[in-house]
């Protein structure tokens, strides 16, 4: 969610909205928790959540993200596509809420993403989710728990071939948690 060039966020929002209107012409963007979505439609809404965030519309991004997450949970689908979207969305919501300084809520969504990942077969994002949890804990002044998570995460990331991510965690650890023991 954090990777964008900042250029055409508004245009991206418009294009994603237009794409969704192709299959859901009468969708009410103020309340779609009761809608049923195909994996493609759900993916468009997940991307729209990210686009709103990148455009600085955090509250809209949170609202849309929470509604699509509710709709996906309500569908009880066994399709792995839906589980992947739920994991991505819960993780994205945790990042947006963290940026808003709403750390308790951010931690709840990060833990939801963690649980969905662990309980399912989709663990590809788990290291990034664990890093997010550690960052949230650091922001909540739970530095020792944050440090322990990061110190365990770095060798694991290197082991599974996520060296760049491990370097990022190491850099964050050195910058934010060096010589900090509370």
Predicted regions located by residue number:
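Structural motif corresponding to the intra-repeat A-B loop/turn of tetratricopeptide repeats
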Residues: 6-7, 55, 100, 133, ...
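TPR-repeat structural position
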Residues: 9-10, 58, 103, 143
């Amino acid at each position: 969610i954090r990777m964008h060039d900042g250029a055409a966020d508004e245009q991206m929002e418009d294009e994603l909205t237009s794409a969704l209107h192709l299959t859901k012409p009468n969708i009410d963007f103020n309340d779609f928790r009761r809608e049923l979505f195909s994996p493609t439609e759900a993916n468009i809404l997940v991307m729209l959540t990210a686009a709103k965030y990148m455009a600085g519309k955090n509250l809209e991004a949170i609202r849309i993200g929470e509604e699509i997450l509710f709709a996906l949970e309500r569908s009880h689908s066994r399709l792995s596509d839906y589980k992947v979207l739920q994991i991505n969305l819960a993780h994205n919501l945790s990042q947006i809420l963290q940026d808003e300084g709403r750390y308790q809520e951010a931690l709840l969504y990060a833990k939801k993403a963690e649980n969905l990942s662990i309980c399912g077969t989709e663990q590809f994002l788990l290291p990034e989710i664990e890093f997010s949890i550690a960052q949230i804990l650091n922001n909540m002044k739970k530095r020792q728990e944050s440090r322990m998570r990061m110190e365990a995460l770095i060798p694991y990331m290197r082991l599974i071939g996520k060296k760049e991510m491990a370097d990022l965690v190491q850099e964050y650890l050195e910058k934010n948690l060096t010589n900090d023991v509370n």
